[in-house]
């Protein structure tokens, strides 16, 4: 694709969700489940998949191994019409695989490969020449790939802004004890930041949504969108604040990828020129559908599902 809407940079891995499991899984010799299956996972491929299904042209920039798991990812991208021109395959590494242990109430713990592709992704895997082809850059999760540190992120975002791209970013909890100071310069280029409340509280050391948002705004983030789970989201831009409630009546089966789905919905709405509240409502609806199925990209099969839920949603 020569003309793109979004470039997603970040992890592309394979998830093996095991559900439902209980806390006593290690107290028995055998733990039968109804079904065990592989799905694609990782923040960037999750976003690329959902944004593509929502109707926008999307490219994935990541690094995978030249192995069975990597081929699984390539096949998925082709099926979902995701541009993989800048998805690098490296014969010297293993594609990261995450085994997700998911409880009955949707909470999860990951068992991960510390030496997999997720940990090898670095700035050399970013194809800057393609930035001019897209409108928006999504750095799918700050801290997820440790080699994409504050310095690397600053370079990526500088290159994106030189091409007038909108920059969105999500984050996870720091893996290597990174601090807000480590990424503050990079954040000064970010137009929309999508942390969840627990991650943002940990990183900033603040307790309230307002205080947390102010820390990110002080770094130069233009709009802070804090995901608050069952409460929806909190938005702050300058002196303007807004709370947008979640979709009511949703019972989560699996929360894996819910944040990625939220970001995807928000990004899709941004590209369509929707205002902040409309973007948040669309994001909340996208996330709500995602948690009703096992797997990060299983629930949101098409745009129609989101639009149908929006008709019932009073956010």
Curated annotation (Swiss-Prot):
The keyword Transferase applies. GO terms for biological process: D-galacturonate catabolic process; D-glucuronate catabolic process; DNA damage response. It holds the Pfam family PfkB. Signal peptide: none annotated. GO terms for cellular component: cytosol. One of its GO terms (molecular function) is 2-dehydro-3-deoxygluconokinase activity. The keyword Isomerase does not apply. Keywords: Kinase, Transferase. Its EC number is 2.7.1.-. Belongs to the carbohydrate kinase PfkB family. This is Uncharacterized sugar kinase YdjH. The lineage of its organism: Bacteria, Pseudomonadati, Pseudomonadota, Gammaproteobacteria, Enterobacterales.
